[in-house]
Amino acid sequence: MNKIFLAAIAILSIAAPVSAVAQFYENIPSQAQFAGSSLSSRVPSADMSSSFAQPYDHILRGNLWNESMNANGIRNVIDTAAIALYKPLQVTGKDGKNKPLAISYAQGYGTIENGDYRPSWGSGSLWRAGAKAESIMHLKSFSMKGAFGFEHQEGKDMCASMFINPGFYPIDIIEYTPGRKTLQTYTFDGAIAVDVADNWRVGGELDFRGSNYSKRKDLRHVNYGLHILFAPSVQYYNDIWALGLTYILSKDSENVDAEQIGTTGDVLYAFIDKGNAYGMFGIWDNSGIHLDEMGVKGFPINQISNGVALQYSRGKLFGELKWLYSNGQAGEKQFIWYKFHSNEFSLKLGYKINDNHSIRLSGTYFDQTNRESLLDKVTEGGVTTVRFLGSNQIYNRKNHSLALQYNYDSRKFDLQFKGGWLAQRSVSNVKYPFSQKNEMKTWMADANAVWHFGLVDLGAELFWGNGSYELSSWDVDQESGVQSEGDFEIMKYCSDMLYNAGSRAGGNLSLRFNFKPGLWFEISEGLVSGKAYCNWTYSADSGNQALLPEPDNAQRWHTSLKIGYNF
């Protein structure tokens, strides 16, 4: 029965393509780690403090290939001894016959977050609930890995960015009326690796994430987000070394469909951020903001990425080099308002010192440019067409990141240290002849430990971070006669920069009870403290940053409950 269930997880995930876990309000994909509003690794989540020390994660982390883009890495290290340690009946069943080598888990969880330490678009009171399952199974000539999950989130008094993952795209749209927002995320993930000949494997991974994001108060909006990734791969291996190659194809898309249906007659405003919080402020259905453009439904934006990844391992050393080129646009049909492209290079290195100790190093370089189209509407014979007159580069951002991680894994005690440094340099040219440059740096350290006392696991985590940021402006043509740089959303800029690069510290505590034959229950509590602008309202203004109030000391509490089953 277990064999059938495990196969169902893996096959279902492959047939209905996943990406790892649901994206939270305060998480964004790695591409945009310094894009603007948030960082994916910015603040550790309270419900993550002990997950790295559980059986499934032990097995996953024991094979450095599992962190690569190559699905064939699933079979590169089949840790029979480790799986047998957690599940002795898996290798040889009660009847003495061989069984599939597999490990899986399923869990349901709920989290409540409260506090003013949050990004500009975050909620002071947020709850989320969801369920997920993951499985790895090895058979004689092939292996499968699968996962699926669902998460529902709801936050109060939310406004600012209208996108699901603020900062992922080089354009953002801000709205100014706080209200309740909900986000539902569905994820499916499947990977398979097959031995096709002596020393050769082929495989592939298919990821899918679908999101529905909505606000039910004017200015209300409904978003539909989609991420899909396909990564076929090949691997050659022998007893000494292994070499792999992966092709990567992915698509990300989102559509913001906004409307005002209230009867109060209030005039609602919006702001389109074209880079470094410079852009255009006006009534939300203004044609320059593009939320209500005739001939286009909503604000559609998408990106297609192509790339390759090369993997190599020798003995206990593993490395992966990845390159990704992305092309995207905002708009549709004749109305293409923005076009952007990017290059991303990343390097991962890992070394297993022995069965207990491992170390990982990663680095990323990301360069993205956005251009704004010059369009002209022409009506001839009652037919309106749009002419493309050219484009101007309005924004460029370059991100650099380095991360170092050390793990000690054992049956009695698990320890994880992480350190990271990230930097962004972005230049906006929204209104000629002015240019603005923003430079931001941030670094953080995290220590996480879990003690296993029989049927009880006690986890503790401490983290700290700091950074700096600076915005400068200059005029490339002082004789142009233009006096204004354009609309500047000063509160968005200051709030986001302080959240990303300000000093912060916090910690998590978790307690897990393990019941035989695999059932467990966990409670965790976390706190983060830092500086934030707690009492302010948005108003696009080109005012002086020095006139802003001093930021407040703010905290945020996380409480999480989880129940699950390891099998």
PLM region descriptions:
Residues I103-I112, G146-H152, G204-G210, L245-K251, ...:
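Transmembrane beta-barrel strands of outer-membrane/channel proteins
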Residues A242-I248, V256-Y278, K516-F567:
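Predominantly the C-terminal beta-signal and adjacent terminal strand-loop region
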Residues F281-W421:
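Long, internal scaffold/assembly segments composed of regular secondary structure
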Residues K97-S104, K140-G146, D198-V202, D239-L243, ...:
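Outer-envelope beta-barrel architecture signal
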Residues L85-V91, A131-M137, F188-V194, F230-Y236, ...:
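Residues on the lipid-exposed face of transmembrane beta-strands in outer-membrane beta-barrel proteins
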Residues N114-G122, D157-F163, Y213-H221, V256-G262, ...:
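Outer-membrane beta-barrel translocator domains and adjoining extracellular loop/strand segments
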Residues F24-F52, L60, Y236-D239, A554-F567:
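Outer-membrane beta-barrel "beta-signal"
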